Every structure is written in C-alpha cells, then in structure tokens.
C-alpha cells in the first residue's frame, strides 16, 4: 500500500473529549472516526488491524473444531422473554428496542444466547452431533449510559462469541477447557500482558466463569493476582489479617455517642482500633420488581463486596441503601444501624465470626453498644464471605500467598451456563435408555474492539501507538525525503520486492520531509521503519528502526534475510496484507 492511496488522516491535536488514551490515539492516528456518541466508523487503517485480529481468532477456533456462522442482529422479544432476560436488560436501560409494522417488539442484539439456542433446538437431531461449537464475529449493541471511553465502552461494538452444546457436565467442562486454551493462544500471539481471573457470571449465568484481563493503567477493573492465580476483585476469595480478641466476655454497655457515626469517629471516641468495631451496612436487594432490605455486618477495617452479596442471596440487583431508604425501613439514620435487635434480616461476614467485646451501633441515633458478644447478646447470624479483597490478603488458591492488586481491562469472558438456556428452548436428545436429556451449554466472547483498544492502552508511548507485530496494519514503513529521486527509486524497488515476498509494506510516497513521515509512522504504530536518509545516500546502507527503538544497519543484499528473521511469517497469510 502507498500512503498516497491510503484513505486516512492523522491529527496533531488530541480530542479534548477523549477520556482515555486509546480513544485519543486511535482517533488522532486515523483509526476511528466518531459518527455519534459511542458509535464509530472503523477506517481502512483500523480494519486492517481488525482483520488480522480476526484471522488469529478464526485460526485458533477452527483448530479446535469451531464452526463459524452468522446470527441475526435483530431479535424478537419473545425469545428474550422466554429466558427472563427481556425485562432484566430493559431495566438497566442497555437494550435497544423497536417495534415493527406488525406492532411486534424486537431488540438489537447485545448478545446471542437466545437466538443460537433456539437455532440449535431446531437442528439438533441426536447425541452423535454433540459436542457442537458454533461461533461468529459480529456487531453487537448496548445503550451505554456514559460512552466516553471510545472502543472500550461503545454503543455499537465488534465481538467474537462462541457457543458450545454438550451431552453432559463432563463434556461441557471439556469444551470449556478447549475454549480457554484457544483464547490463551489468541492473546499469547498478541504478545501482551494479560491474566485470567475467576469472575462472577452476572446476568449471563451462574456457572463456572473466568475473565481475561489486559493489564493497563486505565483501571476499568481491579484484579487480584497471586502467583499464577487471578480473580476479579468482585469474586476474589481472600483471607484477611487475623487479630486476637478477648477470651473473657465483658459486661455489655449502652453508650451515648452524639453524632459519632463513622468508623473513624468511633475509633477516636472509644480509643480502639477499627477491627474491634462491627460495621453494619444496609443493602437493597432486587428480585424482579420486588425490593427487600438486609443488613450486613463486617469488621470495621474492611469493606463489603456487593457482587458477593448479590450472588449469595440470589438477587437480580444489589446496592447500598440510600439514607432515605434506611430511615423509612429501619427508623434510624445511616451510621447507627447495628446487629443487636436489628429490625431487618441480618447476615455477617466471616471476619466477624471470632470477634468478642466489639462495638456496634444501637439502631437508634447517637447510640452504640460496647462489649457486645455473639451468643450472649446476639444470636449467631448466618455467616458468609462478603469481603472485598485487598492487597496483602492471603490467597487460599495459591497456598495462602499474598495478593497483589492490578488494574486491567476485561477483553474476554468465558462461562459454563449449564442448562439454563437449553431448558428454556428444549434443546436435548435421547440417551441410551430412551429418556429425553437436556444439553449443557457454554458461552464465550472476545471483544475485538476492546482488545485492540487495550493493546493501545498497554503498549503506547509518547510517540503514539505501538501495535503488536501480529496485528499491525503494515509490517514495515518505507520512508524517504520527498523530492529525493535517488531515495525514491530505491524505495520503489524495495517496496516491490517486499510485496512480491508476501509482506505488507507501507510506502510513504508523499512529497513531505523525512521527519514528518517518521512522526506519522510512529503515531500509527508500524513495527519497523526502513529509512532511506543520509546514511543510505552516502553509503548505500539501509537504516531500519523498530517501533521500540532498536536499530539495524543492513546492506541491500541482506535485506531479504533480515525480513525473514524480523517480520513475522504469519503476516504473509493475513487477509489484510
């Protein structure tokens, strides 16, 4: 490709509305164009990168027996109503809905579990067809509330999604492991830093679930890592620091605590450390259209994890109660809710199990109790893990080694769904005994646009984008001073040789000075620059510089050999070349 033929445009100035680095650089370098809020045109330059990414995805999924198809984007409401997700998604305001001329409701697909399950239910003829692995790479839609992060949180986005159907839980797990390894190979080929973490299934399902996170400073998600084990902070099981408590119970005391409502206030008032305080928070749980309130007790130096609470109590949604909701439902104020005679159902985190002689609020304004104890003063509640993990907590899945906390961006998610969807659509087969048996399902997805944006977030430097070699739009740029006929002639010859050898060079044939071309090449992130400058004119030596700054001096006769060593062979097979 010649730059004079490439339809692209770079900009000197950053978009002031770009909230993250990837949005700024992808727009500045001519990869995306904002069509509307959260909606982007993928330019020819971007599409070259996306095609290479999709080539890698297809190669790895086809290698494990995946079959590509294309599912519809327009979904009838009754399919989503069948699984109960129509109202769940609409309640969050994320679903694009419309009504056709027959007054039937439809939506633009945010995901495809319902559609693919209905399709398989009609075509599956018997057990011998299982397992089935179907996948697509397609556009999806979500009406995001604040689509400010470019491709990280767009309203229209490109995804690969896979669906597996199996004859048993064992076969479902085998398919899960195959997809997990395939996804690992995909991200390994990108040569980026990522971790696989245990995750919460959310609205998709409640089976085994893991996320792939690219590590970067954007910090959309917080992940806990200990050795080779990782978990999203929403799902991380952690063992906090343990403290020694009194063995002898002291007499309980009611204490007036005027306007003493925070942990810090209580520490100062009673002159005690926070781990001797029982903190109680009121949580609103939503079950469809019904709301209920529960109280959660936790050690005063720690925070609750709302995702764990939602999962444990099987709620659709979970949030901290507002001041008004606390007043209306408990008759007291925030900061004065406690476990003693609590008027709503009370649960406690495991951190509180061994606490003795603790301080807690008295369910009335300006009142606390001192030296409170389980069994004597309060019946023991139901304990569960409601703890939000922190750096330094011990990881039980890694021999109680400590956690480190990192920031990352979720780029892929894999789930075991069990029979949640297949039961709704009667997807099954007859077993050896002639009994009808339901299929077991898995769902998996890679955000193509999110992955590319995450690569930019992780690898970019002060000069611009740094693409992984495997997905860069071009293998190498050929640069010379515009108007220099000798350099131009050599550049044309090298360009032709590279094309004939199957590589994807970008010949910058614009009548611009070399310095301008160098900056453009760095901005758009091409892995190598072949520079035909003074050194070439004086000695005939080719100067090559990698995007990371590594420099090579190569004689023309050795250039083909250099290409074979440094330009990845896989690029020669890419549909973008």
Swiss-Prot record:
GO function terms (MF aspect): aminoacyl-tRNA deacylase activity; ATP binding; proline-tRNA ligase activity
Keywords: Aminoacyl-tRNA synthetase, ATP-binding, Cytoplasm, Ligase, Nucleotide-binding, Protein biosynthesis
SS bond partners: none
GO cellular component: cytosol
Predominant subcellular localization, coarse grouping: cytoplasm
SUPFAM superfamilies documented for this protein: Class II aaRS ABD-related, Class II aaRS and biotin synthetases, YbaK/ProRS associated domain
Localization annotation: Cytoplasm
UniProt xrefs under InterPro entries: aa-tRNA-synt_IIb (IPR002314), aa-tRNA-synth_II (IPR006195), aa-tRNA-synth_II/BPL/LPL (IPR045864), Anticodon-bd (IPR004154), Anticodon-bd_dom_sf (IPR036621), Pro-tRNA-ligase_IIa (IPR002316), Pro-tRNA-synth_IIa_bac-type (IPR004500), Pro-tRNA-Synthase_IIa_type1 (IPR023717)
Catalysed transformations (reactions): tRNA(Pro) + L-proline + ATP = L-prolyl-tRNA(Pro) + AMP + diphosphate
GO biological process: prolyl-tRNA aminoacylation
EC code: 6.1.1.15
Summary of subunit composition and partner proteins: Homodimer.
Domain text: Consists of three domains: the N-terminal catalytic domain, the editing domain and the C-terminal anticodon-binding domain.
Entry similarity comment: Belongs to the class-II aminoacyl-tRNA synthetase family. ProS type 1 subfamily.
HAMAP family: Pro_tRNA_synth_type1
Protein's job: Catalyzes the attachment of proline to tRNA(Pro) in a two-step reaction: proline is first activated by ATP to form Pro-AMP and then transferred to the acceptor end of tRNA(Pro). As ProRS can inadvertently accommodate and process non-cognate amino acids such as alanine and cysteine, to avoid such errors it has two additional distinct editing activities against alanine. One activity is designated as 'pretransfer' editing and involves the tRNA(Pro)-independent hydrolysis of activated Ala-AMP.
Protein name as catalogued: Proline--tRNA ligase
Native source organism of the sequence: Chlamydia felis (strain Fe/C-56) (Chlamydophila felis)
């Amino acid at each position: 490709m010649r730059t004079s033929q490439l339809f692209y445009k770079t900009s000197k100035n950053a978009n002031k509305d770009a909230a993250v680095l990837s949005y700024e650089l992808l727009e500045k370098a001519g990869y995306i164009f904002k069509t509307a809020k959260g909606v982007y045109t993928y330019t020819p330059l971007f599409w070259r990168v996306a095609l290479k990414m999709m080539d890698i995805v297809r190669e790895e999924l086809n290698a494990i027996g995946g079959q590509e198809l294309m599912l519809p984007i327009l979904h009838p409401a009754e399919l989503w109503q069948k699984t109960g997700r129509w109202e769940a998604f609409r309640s969050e305001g994320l679903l694009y809905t419309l009504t056709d001329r027959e007054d039937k409701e439809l939506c633009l697909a945010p995901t495809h579990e319902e559609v693919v399950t209905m399709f398989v239910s009609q075509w599956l003829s018997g057990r011998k067809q299982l397992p089935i692995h179907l996948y697509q790479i397609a556009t999806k839609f979500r009406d995001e509330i604040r689509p400010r992060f470019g491709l990280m949180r767009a309203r229209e986005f490109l995804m690969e999604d896979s669906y597996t159907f199996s004859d048993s839980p064992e076969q479902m797990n085998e398919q899960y492991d195959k997809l997990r390894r395939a996804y690992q190979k995909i991200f390994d080929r990108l040569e980026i830093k990522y971790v696989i973490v245990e995750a919460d299934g959310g609205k998709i399902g409640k089976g085994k679930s893991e996320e792939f996170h690219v590590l970067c400073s954007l910090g959309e998600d917080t992940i806990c890592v200990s050795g080779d084990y990782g978990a999203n902070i929403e799902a991380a099981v952690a063992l906090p620091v343990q403290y020694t408590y009194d063995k002898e119970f002291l007499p309980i005391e009611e204490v007036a605590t005027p306007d003493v409502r925070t942990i810090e206030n209580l520490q100062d008032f009673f002159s005690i450390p926070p781990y001797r305080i029982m903190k109680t928070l009121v949580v609103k749980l939503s079950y469809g259209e019904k709301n209920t309130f529960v109280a959660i007790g936790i050690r005063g130096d720690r925070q609750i994890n709302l995702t764990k609470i939602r999962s444990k109590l099987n709620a659709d949604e979970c949030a901290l109660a507002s001041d008004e909701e606390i007043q209306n439902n408990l008759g007291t104020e925030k900061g004065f809710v406690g476990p003693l005679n609590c008027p709503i159902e009370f649960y406690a985190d495991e951190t509180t199990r061994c606490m003795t002689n603790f301080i807690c609020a008295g369910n009335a304004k300006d009142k606390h109790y001192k030296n409170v104890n389980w069994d004597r003063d309060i019946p023991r509640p139901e304990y569960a893990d409601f703890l939000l993990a922190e750096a330094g907590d011990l990881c039980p899945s890694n021999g109680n080694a400590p956690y480190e906390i990192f920031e990352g961006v979720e780029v892929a998610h894999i789930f075991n769904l069990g029979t949640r969807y297949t039961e709704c659509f009667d997807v099954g087969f007859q077993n050896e005994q002639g009994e009808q048996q339901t299929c077991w399902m898995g769902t998996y997805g890679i955000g193509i646009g999110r992955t590319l944006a995450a690569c930019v977030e992780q690898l970019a430097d002060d000069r611009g984008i740094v693409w992984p070699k495997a997905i860069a739009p071009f293998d190498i740029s050929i640069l010379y001073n515009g108007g220099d006929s000798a350099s131009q002639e050599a550049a044309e010859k090298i360009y032709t040789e590279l094309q004939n050898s199957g590589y994807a060079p970008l010949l910058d044939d614009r009548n611009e000075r070399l310095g301008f071309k160098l900056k453009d090449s760095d901005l758009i992130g091409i892995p190598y620059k072949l520079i035909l400058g003074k050194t070439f004119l004086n000695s005939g030596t080719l100067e090559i510089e990698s995007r990371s700054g590594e420099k090579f001096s190569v004689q023309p006769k050795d250039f083909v050999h250099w290409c074979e060593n440094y330009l990845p062979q896989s690029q020669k097979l890419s549909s973008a070349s």
